[in-house]
């Protein structure tokens, strides 16, 4: 958890295991950077969200000495305070000579809902692909802060570095698979055979590195504090997850907290949902909730 009270000059001592994880993360960055250069003649692209995991991978990228750029995908449902925080971080990055940009979507979440007549849910994630996971042509190799500790579902995923390829020939065999991964310190699970280093997705041609996939929450916070990084101010106000306001993947308490703080975004959700329900009723295709049409 974030440290609310601490002396300014206090040094947070990391454990040998944590120091080892940091060193391994450096190697993951360096391996991926070489691959990005070899395959695309481009630097890595760090996907920055403003959350604690993003702060970690950004700092690790700096410390690893690799060439990289930073991007943030604006979703139009972002907490305004998070947008302000990202702008401050990016201003400092530009002062350091690091290329960074905020990518604005073609359609807002509210327009997507009105045009698709779908309300985002845990099952119907119509928003994520276009707003959060959209690919940029000049970002073929990205870095994210995905971690197994965030959810059981992510632990079931195979990868520290996942390759999403448009052609089936681009697979683990393409780069030597587990042998290359092990040599680079990428494959750290006890049962490597149960986890593929690379995954394939024909829908997008992009490679993804998740350098802190095996870090715990304590690893994340201890690392940030050891570097003097306070992180997003929203954490100190009780937020445990920095993401879209009203996201159905967040818990009910998190949504209530966000809506109370940002009433304009609550109204945007309310109006878009009301439009979808009414329009579908007019079309004879009403929304169904608990087996009954929504009136």
Where are these regions (language model features)?
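Nucleotide-activated chemistry modules centered on ATP-dependent adenylation/adenylyltransferase
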Residues: 1-295
